[in-house]
From Swiss-Prot:
Subcellular location(s) per record: Cell projection, Cilium
InterPro entries in alphabetical order: CEP15-like
Record gene name: Cep15
Superkingdom to which the source organism belongs: Eukaryota
Name of the protein described by the UniProt record: Centrosomal protein 15
Upper taxonomic lineage: Eukaryota, Metazoa, Chordata, Craniata, Vertebrata
Length: 127
């Protein structure tokens, strides 16, 4: 009977040790998960802060680039605008003549003396 009693005491002590280890491990797990959650929240906040900073930097870069471009390209003078407008009007006026020539449906569009230099051969154009 004494051996059963000593065995009971030994098992009781072992049970207490196991329970204390369990409690200690649970506390460690709780601390670890708490630390991980804190770290995760900190990383999330740092990421959001970095994203906002990056967006501000991109906007600043875009604004600086736009300001640089406006300084780099001066406003054209009125005479240059007039010349450009007349040029494009002339191009649009002559497009139909050149288009027909390039499609092989009409002779060389500018002057009769130049027709000898660039002969119009309708049979080649149709092939």
């Amino acid at each position: 009977m004494a051996s059963l009693f000593t065995q009971e005491i030994h098992l009781s002590k072992r049970h207490e040790e196991i329970l204390s280890q369990r409690l200690m491990l649970l506390q460690k797990m709780k601390n670890k998960f708490g630390d991980e959650n804190t770290e995760r929240a900190s990383l999330l906040q740092a990421t959001e802060t970095a994203s906002r900073r990056n967006l501000r930097l991109l906007k600043d870069i875009d604004a600086a680039e736009e300001a640089f471009q406006t300084k780099l390209i001066p406003h054209p003078q009125p005479s240059m605008l007039s010349l450009e407008t007349r040029y494009w009007a002339s191009v649009e006026e002559h497009i139909p003549k050149w288009e027909l020539f390039l499609l092989g449906r009409a002779p060389y569009p500018i002057g009769a003396e130049n027709q000898n230099e660039v002969p119009f051969v309708q049979t080649e154009a149709k092939l």
